[in-house]
From Swiss-Prot:
Record-stated family: Belongs to the fungal immunomodulatory protein (FIP) family.
GO BP: regulation of immune system process
Alphabetic keyword roster: Acetylation, Lectin
InterPro entries, per database record: FIP_sf (IPR036344), Fungal_ImmunoLectin_sf (IPR053742), Immunomodulatory_FIP-Fve_fun (IPR015339)
Function: Lectin with specificity for complex cell-surface carbohydrates. Possesses immunomodulatory activity, stimulates lymphocyte mitogenesis, suppresses systemic anaphylaxis reactions and edema, enhances transcription of IL-2, IFN-gamma and TNF-alpha and hemagglutinates red blood cells.
Gene Ontology MF term list: carbohydrate binding
Subunit and interaction comment: Homodimer.
Keyword Acetylation annotated: yes
Protein name, per record: Immunomodulatory protein FIP-Fve
Annotated positions of the N-acetylserine modification: S1
Length: 114
């Protein structure tokens, strides 16, 4: 269960402070999603992010600065040749664990038009 996993992690790590609640940033026109901001990310390693749109892999990028407050913005324009992603498409963002050759990754956010 999520509860048991949380306590197991608390036992092993002791203190973790993060917030991966996705804040989707709209572009111009507002029917496009240009970025995604996580309020407070883990900073123990330099994580990369994979973006997948409607099942099409747009690649992995890693050069996103962490703000002094710990937030990080993933810029979709960097993945999509300078364009945002239409909000009618499904957007999946995966965090890629460094030093695994991009082989270990976990979905961290998903946009689905409702």
């Amino acid at each position: 269960s999520a509860t048991s996993l949380t306590f197991q992690l608390a036992y092993l790590v002791k203190k973790i402070d993060f917030d991966y609640t996705p804040n989707w940033g709209r572009g111009t026109p507002s029917s496009y999603i240009d970025n995604l901001t996580f309020p407070k990310v883990l900073t123990d390693k330099k994580y990369s992010y994979r973006v997948v749109v409607n099942g099409s892999d747009l690649g992995v990028e890693s050069n996103f600065a962490v703000t002094p407050s710990g937030g990080q913005t993933i810029n979709f324009l960097q993945y999509n040749k300078g364009y945002g992603v239409a909000d009618t498409k499904t957007i999946q963002v995966f965090v890629v664990i460094p030093d695994t050759g991009n082989s270990e990754e976990y979905i961290i956010a998903e946009w689905k038009k409702t």
